[in-house]
UniProtKB/Swiss-Prot annotation:
Main location, first listed in the record: virion
An annotated GO cellular component: viral outer capsid
Subcellular location field: Virion
This protein's encoding gene: Segment-6
Any GO BP: symbiont entry into host cell via permeabilization of host membrane
Record region (Involved in membrane permeabilization): 1-42
GO molecular function, one term: structural molecule activity
Origin species: African horse sickness virus 6 (AHSV-6)
Identification of the protein by name: Outer capsid protein VP5
Pfam families documented for this protein: Orbi_VP5
Length: 504
């Protein structure tokens, strides 16, 4: 357990002076319209919202112009995968989630319809039966009295799909670590196929980074959408040759409606079991100009294996520790579904393993807090709070509340969220705090923070902790995040927490 506090660092007056100096103006004139477009679209823009989060910082102090342009790149591909909306805008979050859900459902249906027979061969017909039930294509009587049977089939199906994905990517990871001369023909072919996908992703990112106006950017996003579909599945299940029907693990699992039937029949929410299609570490490697050695690429791929294994361990935890409790609830109702069963097993939405966002009742635009909860089997959480008015960040490992999804006793280590929140608020009141802001914080201290919503974690919990610690200590990263309008700063900080940022 630990607690860390720090003052955030912004680009200060030295940067401002450098940007407006006579030398800078001469260099702007020499650079012509290309640099002008970059600078004009820089502040508050997310023009390159797919790969770059819009912060191209030009610090012109007389050195080589090419060396002086810095790029802060969010390590996700937001235009076609995920990107965090403004954490203090529930409406924006809701709209984002709805749009993502519609796009995801359309993609999943296409994958299931295209690869129907192959899915049956690989994972069995029972999982397709679950999809038919959830889509209303099978008779309701088919489910009656067999609810627990279908719940167990769905959980075992999720674990089977997850372990298959882990095994496939682990084979690639081990092949990349093997000496080239000692690789089998299958390993050589596997690496060659993945290198093609990785190089295509690398090329798409390079084009994104070079784009200097929105029209070109839109074309690059369209191009990236195809590249990402194939790059998302490192070792294909099947159908990798056709970009419009690539069968990703997430699409198959979602299309089979496994989490939905579990939630409907038991009240157990497994929406947190989600893995980033392309892990941020892989995108980070793709950003580098030089060819990436096999061993470095292997370590980036290993990061995705770690997330998948974390999700599989969580599924095993549900099967071993939670399902016996579900069966007891069903026994109370003659082993048939009853409307009281989901409510008996449901936990509070603020205790689910996600990033939960809060703000203060007063001066809400300036202060926001993220409470990050690990998967249930880990029983861990931390809090990170930001005050953009006084440029302060606070981190503390916190204990989790006991509930049924832990499947037993909870180990209490450290203080709870409420105590950490109180200390964060007290830390903000010091002599140099503006008087009005200080009074508003003191009023907020006596009230519970306002809950603004949650976001799903798609990296491992350890990676999330690492991202948070960088926001506490990395002053270079802070300077890139704390630029532009407040809304944009909050969004950039949220993306930096969920995905990480590479300052290139």
């Amino acid at each position: 357990m630990g607690k860390f506090t720090s003052f955030l660092k912004r680009a200060g007056s030295a940067t401002k002076n450098a940007l407006t100096s006579d030398a800078a103006k001469r260099m702007y004139k020499m650079a012509g319209k290309t640099l002008q477009k970059v600078v004009e679209s820089e502040v508050g823009s997310s023009a390159i919202d797919g790969v770059m989060q819009g912060t191209i910082q030009s610090i012109i102090q007389g050195e080589n112009l090419g060396d002086s342009i810095r790029q802060a790149v969010i390590l996700n591909v937001a235009g076609t995968l995920e990107s965090a909306p403004d954490p203090l805008s529930p409406g924006e979050q809701l709209l984002y989630n709805k749009v993502s859900e519609i796009e995801r459902a359309e993609k999943e249906d296409r994958v299931i319809e295209t690869h129907n027979k192959k899915i049956i061969e690989k994972y069995g017909e029972d999982l397709l039966e679950i999809r038919k039930i959830m889509k209303g294509e099978a008779e309701a009587e088919q489910l009656e009295g067999k609810e627990m049977e279908y719940v167990e089939k769905a959980l075992k199906g999720m674990l089977k799909i997850g372990k298959d994905q882990s095994e496939r990517i682990t084979r690639l990871y081990r092949a990349l670590q093997t000496e080239e001369d000692l690789r089998t023909s299958d390993e050589t072919r596997m690496i060659s196929e993945y290198r093609e996908k990785f190089d295509a992703l690398k090329q798409a990112i390079e084009l994104e980074q070079q784009a200097t106006h929105e029209e070109a950017m839109q074309e690059m996003l369209d191009l990236s959408a195809e590249v990402i579909e194939t790059a998302a599945e490192e070792v294909p299940i099947f159908g990798a040759g056709q970009a419009n029907v690539v069968a990703t693990t997430r699409a198959i699992q979602g299309g089979l409606k496994l989490k939905e039937i579990i939630d409907k029949l038991t009240g157990i929410d497994l929406s947190h079991l989600k893995v980033a299609d392309i892990h941020p570490h892989i995108i980070e490697k793709a950003m580098l100009k030089d060819r990436i050695p096999d061993n470095e690429l292997a370590m980036a791929i290993k990061s995705k294996v770690e997330v998948i294994d974390e999700m599989n361990t969580e599924t095993e935890h549900v099967i071993e520790s939670i399902i016996p409790l579900v069966k007891k609830e069903y026994e109370k109702h003659d082993n048939k579904y009853h409307v009281n069963i989901p409510s008996a097993l449901k936990i509070h939405s603020e205790h689910t393993p996600k990033v939960h966002i809060y703000t203060t009742p007063w001066d809400s635009d300036k202060v926001f807090i993220c409470r990050c909860i690990a998967p249930h089997h880990q029983q861990r959480s931390f809090m990170i709070g930001f005050d953009l008015e006084v440029e302060f960040v606070f981190y503390e490992d916190t204990s989790v509340e006991g509930h049924i999804m832990h499947g037993g006793a909870v180990s209490i280590e450290g203080r709870g969220f409420r105590q950490a929140y109180s200390e964060f608020m007290n830390s903000l009141v010091y002599p140099s705090t503006p008087e009005l802001h200080k009074r508003r914080l003191q009023r907020s201290l006596g009230s519970h923070p306002i809950y603004m919503g949650s976001m799903v974690i798609t990296v491992s919990y350890e990676q999330l902790v690492s991202n948070a610690m960088k926001l506490v200590y990395d002053t270079d990263l802070q300077m890139h995040c704390l630029r532009g309008p407040l809304k944009f700063q909050r969004r950039t900080l949220m993306n930096a927490l969920l995905f990480g940022v590479k300052v290139a």
